[in-house]
Amino acid sequence: YVVCTIHPFDQSVILDAFGVDVDATYDQFSITYGEAIFNMSNALKMTMYGTASDGSVPPISDAELNLFLASLDCSGKRKELMRCALSLVGRVPYFWGGKSAPGWNSEWNTPKLVTSAGSSSTGTIRPYGLDCSGFTEWVYQTALGVTLYDGTWNQWDATHAITEEELLPGDLGFMAVPGTVPVNHVLLYAGEDAAGNKLWVHCASGIGVVLN
């Protein structure tokens, strides 16, 4: 037998033990060691748990997905769009400039360098995923083999305006008219909740694919 004394400790103990300066610049990238550790930690959480947000965006189970699809009053093609879109909730992070071919991408959630210009995340390492237009393009390609093209501006040009009353699951919604805001955002309409509130599934910056 041995007598043990256990003391709880936080990350600072490990950093001190290995002499890691969290404010030092991480080699080859314009981020600090602290930022690199945070990004890699998120990538690990996404791989292990399907979410980097400590459970705030849990994945949708197959049973929940089937119940949701059964509640929709729309065509089979639109339900397939929703099935594909909702299958990524809580499983794929937001990544500036992130695009993907149809189907599951094994590189999602792995640490990658953000190379697309125009974001505060450019030049940093983040868990690989999709951006907002990359998500809507992936959904349409995977579900129907239809391309919407890359970027919110191109997707706007590939669609036409409808009224709010005409909205059906799978329709696109835009934060603003292209050119009127520095950065736009595109979402997929997913119907209404029990209280009549409109639901949207989209790839949100800093979160990933979410239904709200």
Predicted features along the sequence, with ranges:
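N-terminal capping segments
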Residues: 42-133, 141-143
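...with weaker cross-activation on analogous glycine-rich loops/strands in unrelated enzymes
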Residues: 137, 141-211
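Generic hydrophobic, helix-prone segments enriched in Leu/Val/Ile
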Residues: 1-3, 14, 85, 94, ...
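Short linear motifs in intrinsically disordered/low-complexity regions
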Residues: 11, 132, 155-158
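Intrinsically disordered, low-complexity segments enriched in small/polar residues
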Residues: 17, 32, 48, 53, ...
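Membrane-proximal envelope biogenesis segments
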Residues: 1-72
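Intrinsically disordered, low-complexity, compositionally biased regions/tails
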Residues: 23, 38, 54, 59, ...
